């Protein structure tokens, strides 16, 4: 593996070394101690376990003329059943993404009646439990990352490190995600049962709030020094990560581009958007089972501050796209 790579509990890994010369001998070491099974050019780890396999691996290559020791490779096994809140993991992939582990937990989703900018009945406060931790992109998906998977860039505001925009929910779910997951599975970068997906609205808001109960993750007010919104930046996107991160370590959860999530928006019997949930407790909510429009979260470079609130939601048709909408990926285990 490479520095910054990710290996999950239960995966296998082959460490290998290339050397020139005749009659070579190999001795793999972990933390400077010889490994009895490590006497060839490759060393295999099966069923990776943090308690057994975490460590600094190196190999000594020798023959009658002398020996040389390679520099070490630090191997850290991620136990996906443990809490790694706030830690960033670089996932070796074509898309070159950084992910943050979001641990399981509970939070108050929605907004209180008196919150400034509140939209109304589609934000009824209710307790939500996220029972399974998941990875979420540290940043919005960039144009460079999108290009690395699909070989194209639909964005209006061209810059490799700006968020990709002009992508519909269908573009993400019918094209980008299937290809990315196939690439990652083929390259052995995903453990069995794990896939890149869009987060649910509840997962997105949980990660956005990062323990906060205020209108925004950083308090009850917002300014142009905290986010790109309301035309303060010429109604265009900014480089991802241009503003401060939240407590969990996520950037641009407020502003820049609105972000697709997986949920349908709920309509009442009068075809008016309304909150799908009552004030009753919810566990891993998925939203309505069908609908017409999908939810977007976070507000954008051209939206006013009320759309940037953690609880706020907007919605668009599955095929809708413009330069105000992008996305952020989750990495989750199928249940």
Where are these regions (language model features)?
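Solvent-exposed loop segments of extracellular immunoglobulin-like
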Residues: 20-27
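A short beta-strand segment in extracellular, disulfide-stabilized domains
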Residues: 11-18
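Functional-site microenvironments in short loops/helix caps that host divalent-cation chemistry
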Residues: 108, 113, 117, 158, ...
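A short glycine-rich, aromatic-capped structural motif
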Residues: 92-155, 167-170, 255, 329
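Surface-exposed, flexible coil segments in extracellular/virion-facing regions
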Residues: 30-47, 158-159
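Solvent-exposed loop/turn motifs of extracellular immunoglobulin-like beta-sandwich domains
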Residues: 49-58
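Surface-exposed, proline-enriched loop/turn segments that connect beta strands in immunoglobulin-like
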Residues: 1-4
């Amino acid at each position: 593996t490479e520095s910054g790579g990710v290996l999950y509990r239960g995966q296998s890994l082959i460490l290998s070394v290339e050397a020139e010369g005749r009659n070579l001998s190999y001795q793999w070491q972990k933390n400077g101690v010889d490994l009895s099974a490590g006497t060839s050019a490759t060393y295999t780890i099966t069923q990776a376990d943090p308690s057994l396999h975490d460590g600094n691996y190196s190999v000594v290559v020798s023959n009658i003329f002398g020996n040389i020791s390679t520099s070490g490779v630090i191997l850290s096994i991620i136990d996906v059943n443990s809490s790694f809140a706030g830690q960033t993991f670089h996932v070796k992939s074509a898309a070159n993404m950084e992910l943050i582990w979001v641990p399981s937990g509970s939070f108050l989703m929605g907004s209180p009646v008196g919150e400034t900018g509140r939209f109304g009945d589609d934000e009824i406060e209710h307790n939500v439990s996220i029972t399974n931790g998941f990875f979420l992109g540290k940043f919005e998906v960039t144009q460079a990352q999108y290009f690395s998977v699909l070989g194209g860039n639909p964005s209006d505001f061209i810059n490799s490190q700006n968020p990709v925009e002009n992508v519909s929910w269908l573009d993400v779910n019918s094209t980008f995600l299937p290809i990315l997951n196939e690439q990652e599975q083929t390259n052995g970068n995903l453990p069995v049962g794990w896939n890149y997906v869009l987060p649910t609205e509840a997962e997105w808001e949980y990660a956005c709030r990062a323990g906060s109960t205020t209108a925004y993750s950083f308090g009850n007010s917002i300014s142009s020094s905290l986010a790109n919104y309301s035309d303060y930046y010429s109604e265009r996107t900014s480089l991802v990560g241009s503003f401060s991160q939240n407590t969990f370590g996520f950037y641009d959860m407020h502003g820049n581009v609105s972000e697709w999530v997986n949920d349908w928006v709920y309509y009442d019997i009068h075809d008016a958007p309304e909150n799908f949930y009552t004030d009753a407790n919810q566990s891993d909510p998925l939203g309505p089972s069908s609908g017409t429009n999908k939810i977007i979260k976070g507000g954008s470079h051209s939206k006013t501050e009320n759309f940037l609130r953690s609880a706020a939601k907007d919605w668009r048709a599955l095929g809708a796209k413009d330069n105000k909408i992008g996305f952020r990926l989750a990495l989750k285990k199928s249940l």
